[in-house]
Swiss-Prot record:
It is a multi-pass membrane protein. Interacts with PPIF; the interaction is impaired by CsA. The modification N6-methyllysine is found at K112. It comes from the Eukaryota. The modification N6-acetyllysine is found at K99, K209. Pfam families: Mito_carr. Residues 87-121, 184-218, 285-314 are mitochondrial matrix. PANTHER family: SOLUTE CARRIER FAMILY 25 (MITOCHONDRIAL CARRIER PHOSPHATE CARRIER), MEMBER 3, LIKE-RELATED-RELATED, SOLUTE CARRIER FAMILY 25 MEMBER 3. This is Solute carrier family 25 member 3.
Length: 362
C-alpha cells in the first residue's frame, strides 16, 4: 500500500522537473551501451539530497513568503471548491436538521429538488473566499513562525515549538478570516436560503441592500471562534505529527527520503491533523451556518437555541470533509514548495548548545 501511495505522489502535477532529472540520470552518468561502462551511479537518495540544496530563494526572504502565499491560494481555493457539494449538504443539515436528516438523505433531497447543478451552489464565493484565506493563512503563518522564532531564540524556539506553532497559526488566521468573512456569508446565504440568490453576483448586492456592510462581517467573530482553533490544531498537530512520523514510523531519516516519500508523509500527517481540526471547530461552524442564514440573530442566541446536541449536527460529514481537505491542502502546499524549489526545513532537532546545557553531549 505504501508503494502505491508513493507512486501516486510521483505522478502529482506539481512534481518539480528538476527532481525527474535525478531518476533520468543526474545521479550519475549512464554507461554508453556502445562504449565502456561509466562510473557507478550515486544512490538516488544522495542525489536527491544534493538537488534539494539548490533552492530558488532564501528561507524567510520576501520571495519565499510570496510563493508560500501562492501555495496557500492553490491549496485552499481548489480543495474547498472541489468539496462544495459536501459542504452544501453539511450546511443544510446544520440549519434545517428536520429536512436534511443525514449525509445521504441530504444529497438525495438536494438532487431531487435542485438537480446536479444544485450541488454546485456557492462555488464562486467558496473559490474566491478560500483562495484569499489560503493566501493569508499559509503566507502569514510562515511570516509569524520566522518572526516568533527570532524573538524566542534558537533554544527557546525548540523547547517551545508547539506553542510557537500555535501562536503563529492563530496570528495568521486572525487576518485570514477577515479576508474570508464576506465570501463565507454570501456562500451560506446561497446554499441555505432557497430562492434568495443562485450566484454571488446576485447575492452580494442583495445582502448589502438589506443590511449594509454588517451583512458581510457580522459572522467574523464566530468565524474566528471556528477557524482560529481549527487552524491552531491544523498547523501544530501537523508539525508535531510529521516530527513523530519521521521519528517513530518512517524507517529512514527525512534527508534520505525521496520527494515522493516525503509528500506521502505530508499527506498522512495532514489527514490526522484534519480529523482533530474538525472536532475542535465544529460547534462554532454550526453557529456560523445558522447565523449567516438568519437576520438579526446574535452568536449567543444561536448557541443557546441549538444546545449541546444541536451544535454537533453534521459532525461526521465535517470529519470526512475536513480530514480529506486538510490532507490535500498540505499535500498541494508542500508540492508547490517542491515545484518552486523553496527551502523545506526538516523536523526540528535540539540545538547543540542546548544538548550541552542538558548534559547530552560533552
Amino acid at each position: 500500500m505504501y508503494s502505491s501511495v508513493v507512486h501516486l505522489a510521483r505522478a502529482n502535477p506539481f512534481n518539480a522537473p528538476h527532481l525527474q532529472l535525478v531518476h533520468d540520470g543526474l545521479a550519475g552518468p549512464r554507461s554508453d551501451p556502445a562504449g565502456p561502462p561509466g562510473p557507478p551511479r550515486r544512490s538516488r537518495n544522495l542525489a536527491a539530497a544534493a538537488v534539494e540544496e539548490q533552492y530558488s530563494c532564501d528561507y524567510g526572504s520576501g520571495r519565499f513568503f510570496i510563493l508560500c502565499g501562492l501555495g496557500g491560494i492553490i491549496s485552499c481555493g481548489t480543495t474547498h471548491t472541489a468539496l462544495v457539494p459536501l459542504d452544501l449538504v453539511k450546511c443544510r443539515m446544520q440549519v434545517d436538521p428536520q429536512k436534511y436528516k443525514s449525509i445521504f438523505n441530504g444529497f438525495s433531497v438536494t438532487l431531487k429538488e435542485d438537480g446536479f447543478r444544485g450541488l454546485a451552489k456557492g462555488w464562486a464565493p467558496t473559490f474566491i473566499g478560500y483562495s484569499l484565506q489560503g493566501l493569508c493563512k499559509f503566507g502569514f503563518y510562515e511570516v509569524f513562525k520566522v518572526l516568533y522564532s527570532n524573538m524566542l531564540g534558537e533554544e527557546n524556539a525548540y523547547l517551545w515549538r508547539t506553542s510557537l506553532y500555535l501562536a503563529a497559526s492563530a496570528s495568521a488566521e486572525f487576518f485570514a478570516d477577515i479576508a474570508l468573512a464576506p465570501m463565507e456569508a454570501a456562500k451560506v446565504r446561497i446554499q441555505t436560503q432557497p430562492g434568495y440568490a443562485n450566484t454571488l453576483r446576485d447575492a452580494a448586492p442583495k445582502m448589502y441592500k438589506e443590511e449594509g456592510l454588517k451583512a458581510f462581517y457580522k459572522g467574523v467573530a464566530p468565524l474566528w471562534m471556528r477557524q482560529i482553533p481549527y487552524t491552531m490544531m491544523k498547523f501544530a498537530c501537523f508539525e508535531r505529527t510529521v516530527e513523530a512520523l519521521y521519528k517513530f514510523v518512517v524507517p529512514k531519516p527525512r534527508s534520505e527520503c525521496s520527494k515522493p516519500e516525503q509528500l506521502v508523509v505530508t499527506f498522512v500527517a495532514g489527514y490526522i491533523a484534519g480529523v482533530f481540526c474538525a472536532i475542535v471547530s465544529h460547534p462554532a461552524d454550526s453557529v456560523v451556518s445558522v447565523l449567516n442564514k438568519e437576520k438579526g440573530s446574535s452568536a449567543s442566541e444561536v448557541l443557546k437555541r441549538l444546545g449541546f446536541r444541536g451544535v454537533w449536527k453534521g459532525l461526521f460529514a465535517r470529519i470526512i470533509m475536513i480530514g480529506t481537505l486538510t490532507a490535500l491542502q498540505w499535500f498541494i502546499y508542500d508540492s508547490v514548495k517542491v515545484y518552486f524549489r523553496l527551502p523545506r526545513p526538516p523536523p526540528p532537532e535540539m540545538p547543540e548548545s542546548l544538548k550541552k546545557k542538558l548534559g547530552y553531549t560533552q
